[in-house]
Amino acid sequence: MAEQQTTELTNIDLEAGSEWRFELEADENIALRTLSSDPVFINSQELTPSAWYPIYRHTKSALYAPTSARIQVTNLPASHYTSTSTVQPQLLNLHLAMERQRILSKRGMEQRGPRVMIMGPQSSGKTTVMKNLVNLALGTGMGWTPGAIGLDPSSPPNLIPGSLSISTPSHPIPTHHLAHPLGSPPASTAANTISGDVETASWWLGALEPTNKNAEVWRVLVEHMAEAWGMRCEKDKIANISGLFLDTPAAFTVPTLGTKKDDPKARYTLVSHAIQAFDIDTIIVIGHEKLHIDLSRLPLVQSRQLNVIRIPKSGGAVDLDDHDRETAHIFQVRTYFYGEPPLPPQISSLVGKMVSLDFELSPYSFQIPWSRLVVLRVGEENSAPSSALPLGSSKILSPLRLTRVDPSGPGHVVRLLNRVLALVDVKPEDRIVPAKESEVKEEVKEEKNEKDGEIKQDGEGEKKGEGKGEGEGEGEGKDGEEEGEAEGEDDEEEVPFREEIGTREVMGFIVITAIDTFARKYTVLSPTPGRLPTTVAIAGAIEWVDSA
């Protein structure tokens, strides 16, 4: 018989202006609540009095008490302490200056609200600073909806690693676990948290950081994001007044990142590009004195008279290692497909009100033929090497060039198994190669199968909703396979779409969990049942194995 876990309650008294910091391990889950009438904040979100606030394993955060307060915690973590050294006063001063700009903009005395870029080295707490500033703006009661721009693909604010995003939260963002630092995106089930439906638009880099190899792809993605935000501000006056906060990758601290061969002396080119794209007026540098000086001397910064402000790194910022980051990435991808984890028994059984969380999701696994799902890669680095060209010739390729992935190739070359794919919307005008007769026949067959309402799921036989329809079916037989083989290598190398689709806003994500080379089919995990919204996907370097 399994031992019943007991819950130990501990009261902690906090001095005015102090923080209670904690670092949860893999087997630690806690819940906390405030017992005093004075407010207590977690990342500038006020805790609801007397309500239990669950926090999941691996989370590292802090509670801040502006006045003396008492909190109650279940099962104290192994690593926790109180500190009177806090950066909250500096963050509050920044917030007040930005709030003044918003109010002046609302009165017509300013063109728009603050547009802030946050920079710093790895593990400096950039996302936490951004979350605090967003929550401070949302907690004013003025109805602001600031934009949260996630340009750090290694620490995505809403979705999965490798993605860039724009979200517009309208309520304070909670801190429950690692997956949604800036709120969860809309799911297929009704959300029961006040911040459960944060409007989110996403773009796919497919890598954990910008590099000199993917710099051109990065520039185009940032331009598309800035264009989308500009369109939002034109239609939504409140969004324009509220301003935006832009989280950046740690790679932005490297001066030579993105430097082009024709201008080798240029420095911080991707930083300057983002400043121009989003029309940034304030740069916050966390702890890095040299970076603060370098940015202050940039010609673009001086010509635009931007405010470059340096704030100290919080003493509670934890230096994460590669294992910590990998754990966070796995948790983020799993949460995208399965939803938030259930409450541990020792927390869900607590007496009293509980801050509610989202429901778990039920992803669907199904098969889809290779010929039906077009998998592409973006970037010149995915093309054939120059050594493969005829003697004396050289290649001139677009940095946004699309390369079609041949799933029948060697595994170490194809690299599709357990890869996360981003689904992109393709319009008729995007096609540059006419659809073959076999593809048209297969689409007709798919529609027919979907009408029959049959679906094949892992371990569950056939169910309604997904449809054998993603192009599978016994009717293909050997003739279909022979036809695919007869078409030869040209079909696999041929990219029938314009390269612009590779940097387009994505519709969602799927994972290839198995590849059947005999049946020439993928097994795909999708977050929702039914037909895929598109059969064109962009592959990157992000992998995830569903081991739970």
Swiss-Prot record:
Where found in the cell?
Nucleus
Record's compositionally biased regions (Acidic residues) = 479-494
Enumerate the Gene3D superfamilies for this protein.
Clp1, DNA binding domain (2.60.120.1030), P-loop containing nucleotide triphosphate hydrolases (3.40.50.300), Pre-mRNA cleavage complex subunit Clp1, C-terminal domain (2.40.30.330)
Give the molecular function GO annotations: ATP binding; ATP hydrolysis activity; polynucleotide 5'-hydroxyl-kinase activity
InterPro entries tied to this protein: AAA+_ATPase (IPR003593), Clp1 (IPR028606), Clp1/Grc3 (IPR045116), Clp1_C (IPR010655), Clp1_C_sf (IPR038238), Clp1_N (IPR032324), Clp1_N_sf (IPR038239), CLP1_P (IPR032319)
Write down the superkingdom of origin: Eukaryota
Q: Which residues fall in a compositionally biased region of kind Basic and acidic residues?
A: 437-478
The keyword ATP-binding appears for this protein: yes
Primary site of residence: nucleus
Signal sequence annotation:
none
Which Pfam families has this protein been placed in? Clp1 (PF06807), CLP1_N (PF16573), CLP1_P (PF16575)
Q: Name one GO cellular component term.
A: nucleus
User: What keywords is this UniProt entry annotated with?
Assistant: ATP-binding, mRNA processing, Nucleotide-binding, Nucleus
Instruction: Enumerate the Gene Ontology biological process terms.
Output: mRNA 3'-end processing; tRNA splicing, via endonucleolytic cleavage and ligation
- Role summary: Required for endonucleolytic cleavage during polyadenylation-dependent pre-mRNA 3'-end formation.
Name the family: Belongs to the Clp1 family. Clp1 subfamily.
Give the quaternary structure: Component of a pre-mRNA cleavage factor complex. Interacts directly with PCF11.
This protein's name: mRNA cleavage and polyadenylation factor CLP1
Query: What species does this protein belong to?
Result: Cryptococcus neoformans var. neoformans serotype D (strain JEC21 / ATCC MYA-565) (Filobasidiella neoformans)
The gene designation is: CLP1
